[in-house]
Structure formats: C-alpha cells, structure tokens
C-alpha cells in the first residue's frame, strides 16, 4: 500500500506493490509468497484484480456487490464479487470493447459495444444476443422508461434500439458530422449528446425533437484556459435535475445549469488532453474529472482544488464506488488501481477494515527510507570512477541521479579512499571542539563590510534591555544573523559610501529618526519606572519637541548642501588650474616642435578635414581635441560657468538641471550684420519734411497725385491750402 498526501488529503493506493506474473504456476506463486516479504505485506483487497494486458472500462453494479471490468488481450470481461473479494467469472469476447453498461441491479443484464459495430447482450448465464448498428459506435445510453438504447458514433444520426420490441426505431437527425458521447438525466430523462464540433444537443425522448443546444467550444475559451484547436465534447455527466458537466478534448470542464446557456464555471486541467471521465460527489460538492494523466477533484461552485491523483500508467476510465471514498481506475496497465480517500467518505462495508487500518497508519507515521540503496549523482559516479556503469542494471536512473546497491557503494568507497574513516573521525572531533567553543563567552566581531552600520545595530540591540521591547524590535538585533541581509556585510559592493552626496543629504534625516527612536525608548522606560501618571499637556510638549527636531534637521540639510557647493567650487577651481597648466605645457611643446621643423627641410604638410565639421583655423584644433577628450562632468562645469547651465540639489538627494541653448557663431554674426545694416540705413536716410508747396496740398502739383485736386488732376489726399 502506498500513502500520499496532496493538498493535505491522504490518498491510499491499495493496488501498490509487487504482483506475480500469470505465467507462473500455482506452486511457484506459493513459494514466492513465502519467501518474499514484500509480497507477504502487500494488501490484495480483491484477488486477481487485474487484466492480462490493458483494462479499457470499469463499472460497479447498482447494488454495489459486483465490479465488472472489460479489457484485452484477449478481449474479455471479468466480474468480481465484493462479498467474496475474489473473481466470480470471466467471459471472453470476439472483439475489443469500446464501452459497456449494466442494465440490471446485478450482473444479469449486460450490454457491450464493440469496435466492429456489434452490440452484444449478456444474461446471467452468458452470451444472449448479438446485433449490428449501421455506423461505428462510440457511446450509448439506456432510457429505462421506454427500454430504448441510444447509440452515437461516426454519424449524424442517433440510432435507437428498442429492447422490448427487439427492433430499431427511427433515428434522431442532428446537424453534427459526428458524435462522441451521450448521457441521460436520471430525473427528467433528458437525452444529451456531445458532437465533434463542440456542441451539446439536448433531446426530449417523449417527442423526439431537439429542445436546446449548448455551444461549449466557444464557452471554453476564457482568460484562464489554454485552448489549442477546435474543442470537441469528449465527456458528459448529469447531476440531479439541473446540473450538467461537459468535458472537452482540449482539457476543459464546463459546469452548466440547464436553465442557462452560459457555463457557471470553466475549469482547465492545463494538460491539453481529452477529458475521459466525469463524476459528481454530492456530499462534498465536488467534481472528479479525469484525463489520461491525472484525476482532479475540485469544488463545483468555485473550482478550488480539493486533491488530485496521478497514477503511474495512463488512465482509460474511472469508476467511483457509491456512498464511499473508494474509486477504481482502468489503466494502460495489467493492474487496475484501487484508491481509498477517507476525506471523501468511509470505506465500503465489504472492506470496513480499511478505516481501522488507516487510523493505525495515521497514529504511527513512518518515513520511507531506502536501506538497501544509495542515491548518487553523476558527479559522485565520476569521483568514484563508476561513470561507465551508467545504463547498466547496477544503476537505476531516478530524477537527477541514480540508485545503486549500498554494498557496492561501500566497497567502491573503501577502494577509492581507504582513509575515509580516519577523515570522518577527525571531522567529528573537530565538530565537538567547535561546539564546546561555542559555549564560551565570545567577543562581538565586526564584519569586514559596513562596520559602522553593524556597530550601530549592536548598540541599538544592547540598549533594548527590556524583554518585551526586545521582542518588538527583534528585527534590528537579528539583522546581522539574518541570511537575507548576510550579503550586505560580506560583499564589498554593498559598502556604504559616506562621502557621497546622497548619503550626506540623507544622513541628517536618518540620524533624526534614530534619535527620535532612542528618545521614545527612554521615555517608555521612564514611564514604566514611574508609578504615577504624567500630568496633562504632555502632547503639546511632544509636538513642540518634534517641531524643534524638524527645524534642526532642516538646518543640517541646508548646511550640508552649502558645504557640498563649496567643495564643488574648490574642485572646479583646482581643475581649472590644472587645465591652464596643461595648456601652457602643450604650447611650449608646440613651439619647440615648430623650431625643430624650421631648422629642418621645409616640406608641405596636408590635412584632411573630417566630414561634418567646419574648418576655421589651425588654432582651434587643440581646443577641439580637449573638448572631445573632456569628461561629461568637465563639460557640464564649463556650461555652468558660461551661465547656460544651472544645477540645483534638493533635500532628498535628487538633482535639478536647467540649461539654455546658445546660438551658433554664424547666427550671431548674421544678426549683428542685420543690425548694423539697419543702423546704417537709418543714418543715411534724408528727411523730406522741409519740402512742401502752397499750390494744392497734395503730392503732385495740385492737391493730389496729379495736376488737379484729386488723385488725378483735382484735389486729393494732400492738405488743402488754408
């Protein structure tokens, strides 16, 4: 038996353990059972609860006494009696079974749908009748009031076979190309069929007409689902009279209320595998949905996960035993799994001893230890020289390493390192000595990085003498021991630069907060020491003191800013002096090279101007080179001197930069030339105010522009004579 806990829900796998092969004789099986301890300790709840190769589907009779399973190879059906906990009978079939159903309360009436379109009926004694449907079938449902079997498959029709009359009835015509699953509501007998296009068609068996259609493919696409391709319906299950769960081929489950066309909840398995089975657990309001990889149990109202089961083999079918916490799975494996979940319900009455067994296991939990095997990684194998054994039966791959026999491991370890025991003994002695040293009185050692911060934290920790306050301020005391902040006192990259501008501007605020905290601690100690209450009006004094503290740290911030500006001026002055000295040196060097060249042969030298630059003179070359080589800080300082840049510091350490764009020399020259031109025109302009005539008053000879006084020959715009 294997015990696992998923989401704090205990799950017992009763089929876990070694199984004996079928080809062994009974005598050899008995011998193995006597010799092998693991086989003796295993729990075989139902004898021979397995198939030769694969189990495809599994069902429980209505009375709960019989468990029937269909599988291969060869195709067969097996019936197990729970009262006897053993196999009751086995019947071989002609072809593989797609699905089957139990029509009676016990095993006396069975219907099998085969992959070759045959429908086979079995009675209590065995095979009873066999017929064939027109198309390949995928699922069927039994309508008990009319004794009709509804078959769906690779066709747009729903075939009806009446078991009372023994003949086929008129089929139900649908718009779908193919249909995958079907189900009948146990309360009002509504028939529902899931189509290949992702639609669910609902029919009323009384009138044989479609009453509703649900588009599940479109509803399965939400923000929380991962849908790849067109979803088709792969599972259907009714719950009571109004509940319906639909499973899609892309791994989504849609929970519907039949009164609405929109799903109440959309749940995604996130595996992208078709949903194969759906079951409702009404006592806990759970839905059990299964694909080929996992069985998930979740709340039908909010989708919250209750637990999950992930068998080792792929799942073909799931059957929930009624009114209990037991379920069976048909797998791609000879063994059929039996799971018991006490949180879902009690054990069935035919195996009530499971409740006592699980209670004993919970009282005495045991950890799983592999005493006979040693887990080694690939690096360990290389150090032992056993890398060549990878892939051999001596190593069993598991996760990121391998399991090997513990005896082989000890032998190889002794051969590789014969002095391993001596080293182990020395390590143990060293550990004992270190433990004894830890009990001595130890001096506080400061870390290599941020010593002042560590010293400050230690001082604050020593000031907290009261135990209650020490609990409240436990963060400051344990900061040096906390692994999250351990790097801050070991890595030099985290060293606090106290000479930086940001630290000097923020330090007054931090020191003020620390001072306030220290004062508050002292006041609390005084309050606890005093027996009488303090007089009224203390709040105003605290406010006054806080205002004075605020004024104090504001003045300190201003003083720090003033000191920073003075230091900046001094640095800029020193840099200017250094640049002047460099300029003098470069001029002397250029003059020396000029004299050396004058004594030598005079040869012409050619210079190539770079593209995008304007050549003015050779004297600007050195200045340009200095400008290009200068750092960003030096360029900003030059701009600040020329009044085109202003740099201000705020109280919290940030900077404010304001700059103005200068006009180019060419633009200034053009503007100055225009101003000179206008001034010159103004100076040479002659006034014509002294030139006037008494005839007319206009611009011409008359009073206007012409000879008259108007614009022509008459009086016009000019002034008339008085």
UniProtKB/Swiss-Prot annotation:
Tell me which UniProt keywords the record has, alphabetically.
Answer: Coiled coil, Nucleus, Repeat, WD repeat
Gene Ontology cellular-component annotations: nucleolus; small-subunit processome
Subcellular location field: Nucleus, Nucleolus
Record keywords: DNA damage included? no
Cross-referenced Pfam families: Beta-prop_NOL10_N, NOL10_2nd, NUC153
Biological processes annotated in GO: maturation of SSU-rRNA from tricistronic rRNA transcript (SSU-rRNA, 5.8S rRNA, LSU-rRNA)
Region (Disordered), start-end ranges:
521-555, 572-607, 616-635, 664-722
UniProt biased composition (Basic and acidic residues): 572-586, 664-682
Q: Where is the composition biased (Acidic residues)?
A: 523-534
What segments bear the compositional bias annotation Basic residues?
A: 683-693, 702-722
Where is composition skewed (Polar residues) in this entry?
Answer: 587-600
Q: At which residues are the WD repeats?
A: 50-90, 174-213, 228-266, 270-308, 310-349
Q: Which residues form a coiled coil?
A: 423-476, 511-534, 620-681
Listed disulfide bonds for this chain? none
Which PANTHER family has this protein been placed in? NUCLEOLAR PROTEIN 10
Give the UniProt family note: Belongs to the WD repeat NOL10/ENP2 family.
Q: Report the protein name in the record.
A: Nucleolar protein 10
């Amino acid at each position: 038996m294997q015990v696992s806990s998923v989401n704090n829900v205990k799950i017992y796998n009763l089929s876990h353990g070694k199984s004996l092969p079928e080809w062994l004789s009974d005598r050899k099986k008995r011998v193995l059972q006597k010799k092998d301890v693991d086989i003796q300790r295993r729990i075989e709840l139902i004898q021979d609860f397995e198939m030769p190769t694969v189990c495809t589907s599994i069902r429980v009779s209505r009375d709960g006494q019989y468990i029937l399973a269909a599988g291969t190879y060869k195709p067969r059906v097996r019936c197990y009696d729970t009262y006897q906990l053993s196999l009751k009978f086995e019947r071989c079939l002609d072809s593989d079974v797609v699905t089957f159903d139990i029509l009676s309360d016990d095993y006396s009436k069975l219907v099998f749908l085969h992959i070759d379109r045959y429908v086979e009926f079995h009675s209590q004694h065995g095979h009873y009748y066999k017929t064939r449907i027109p198309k390949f079938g995928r699922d069927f449902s039994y309508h008990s009031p009319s004794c009709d079997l509804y078959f769906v498959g690779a066709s747009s029709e729903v075939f009806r076979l009446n078991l009372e009359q023994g003949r086929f009835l008129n089929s139900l015509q649908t718009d779908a190309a193919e249909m995958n699953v079907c189900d009948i509501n146990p309360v009002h007998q509504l028939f529902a069929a899931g189509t290949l296009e992702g639609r669910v068609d609902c029919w009323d068996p009384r009138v044989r007409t479609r009453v509703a259609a649900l588009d599940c493919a479109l509803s399965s696409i939400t923000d929380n689902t991962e849908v790849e391709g067109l979803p088709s319906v792969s599972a259907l299950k009714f719950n009571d009279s109004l509940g319906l769960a639909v499973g899609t081929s892309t791994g989504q489950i849609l929970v519907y209320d039949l009164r609405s066309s929109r799903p109440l909840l959309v749940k995604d398995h996130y595996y992208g595998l078709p949903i194969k089975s759906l079951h409702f657990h009404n006592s806990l309001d759970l839905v059990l949905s299964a694909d080929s990889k996992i069985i998930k149990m979740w709340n039908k109202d909010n989708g919250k996960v209750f637990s999950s089961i992930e068998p080792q083999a792929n799942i073909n079918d799931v059957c929930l035993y009624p009114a209990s916490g037991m379920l069976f799975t048909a797998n791609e494996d000879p063994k059929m799994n039996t799971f018991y979940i006490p949180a879902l319900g009690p054990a069935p009455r035919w195996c009530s001893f499971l409740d006592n067994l699980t209670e004993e296991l919970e009282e005495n939990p045991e950890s799983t230890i592999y005493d006979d095997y040693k887990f080694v990684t690939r690096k360990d194998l290389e150090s032992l020289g056993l890398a060549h054994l990878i892939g051999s039966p001596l190593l069993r791959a598991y996760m990121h390493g391998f399991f090997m026999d513990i005896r082989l491991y000890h032998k190889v370890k002794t051969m590789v390192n014969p002095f391993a025991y001596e080293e182990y003994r020395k390590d143990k002695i060293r550990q004992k000595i270190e433990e004894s040293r830890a009990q001595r009185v130890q001096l506080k050692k400061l870390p290599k990085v941020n010593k002042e911060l560590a010293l400050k934290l230690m001082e604050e920790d020593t000031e907290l003498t009261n135990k209650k306050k020490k609990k409240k301020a436990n963060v400051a005391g344990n900061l040096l021991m906390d692994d999250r902040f351990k790097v801050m006192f070991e890595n030099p990259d985290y060293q606090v630069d106290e000479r930086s501008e940001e630290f000097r501007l923020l330090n007054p605020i931090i020191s003020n907060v620390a001072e306030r905290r220290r004062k508050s601690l002292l006041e609390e100690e005084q309050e606890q020491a005093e027996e009488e209450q303090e007089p009224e009006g203390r709040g105003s004094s605290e406010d006054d003191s806080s205002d004075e503290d605020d004024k104090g740290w504001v003045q300190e911030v201003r003083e720090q800013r003033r000191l920073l500006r003075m230091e900046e001026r001094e640095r800029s002055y020193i840099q200017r002096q250094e640049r002047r000295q460099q300029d003098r040196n470069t001029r002397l060097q250029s003059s020396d090279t000029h004299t050396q060249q004058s004594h030598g042969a005079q040869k012409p030298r050619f210079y190539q101007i770079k593209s995008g630059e304007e050549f003015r003179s050779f004297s600007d070359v050195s200045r340009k080179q200095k400008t290009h080589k200068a750092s960003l800080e030096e360029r900003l300082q030059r701009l600040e001197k020329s009044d085109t840049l202003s740099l201000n510091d705020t109280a919290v350490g940030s900077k404010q930069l304001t700059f103005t764009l200068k006009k180019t020399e060419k633009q200034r020259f053009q503007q100055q030339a225009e101003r000179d031109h206008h001034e010159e025109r103004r100076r040479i302009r002659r006034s014509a105010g002294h030139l006037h005539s008494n005839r007319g008053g206009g611009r011409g000879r008359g009073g206007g522009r012409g000879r008259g006084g108007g614009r022509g020959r008459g009086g016009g715009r000019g002034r008339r004579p008085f």
